[in-house]
Amino acid sequence: MRFVVGLTGGIGSGKSAAADEFARLGATVVDTDAIAHELTGPGGAAIAQVRRLFGDALVDAAGAMDRKRMRELVFGDAEKKQRLEALLHPMIRAESERRIACAPGPYVVHVVPLLVESPGFRERYPRVLVVDCPEALQVARVRQRNGLAEAEIRRIIDSQIQRESRLAAADDVLDNSGSIAAMQQQVRRLHEKYLALAAV
């Protein structure tokens, strides 16, 4: 049975940066956001269904899902959001499981933004790692990275599980409010811990 760490955190918390560091140290990283982008990218496996369920306007000229339009469509409409999740989540789960099963590293870091919101997550992950930082820093990072307006970023944060609930579910917390070097040092310590746990 492969040792899998579930890595989660709010938008802009630094999940990808932490996951990249785990990968650099030799862990296998399976990132659900990356899988979702593949599924909804040009010619992706979900595109035909996106077109069927939501119409041609949600697929751009390159043949990819128009993420900005989809975000606007589902944010105010619970039924459409549920329809999109019912399409993508099983595909993401199946591809994640396939990649985890054939992962070459000593353990797997499974990056799942909505991990704590997922039913049964406790049974799937021997360890849950939450990447955490203050909300103001989340907003600043996302503005810099994506150029979204602050109101839209706060709307996304409000739609996610509360920070306190996420932290309560954590076995390990990576405080990503400091420097890159400080984050890397924490990842190195956690990597040593996970190597030991994976060897048991």
Residue spans for each PLM region:
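Glycine-rich phosphate-binding loop of ATP-dependent small-molecule kinases
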Residues: 1-65, 185, 192-200
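Residue-level signal for inorganic ion chemistry
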Residues: 14, 33, 84, 109, ...
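Well-ordered beta-strand positions
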Residues: 28, 127, 171-172
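Short, acidic/turn-prone active-site loops that include or flank metal/cofactor-
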Residues: 34-37, 133-136, 155-158, 180
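ATP-dependent small-molecule kinase phosphotransfer cores
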Residues: 34-107
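An amphipathic alpha-helix signature
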Residues: 47-51, 135-143, 150, 154
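Small-molecule kinase domains that catalyze NTP-dependent phosphoryl transfer to phosphate-bearing small molecules
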Residues: 92-95, 104, 122-123, 144, ...
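ATP-dependent NMP and nucleoside kinases share a basic, alpha-helical "lid"
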Residues: 94-102, 107-144
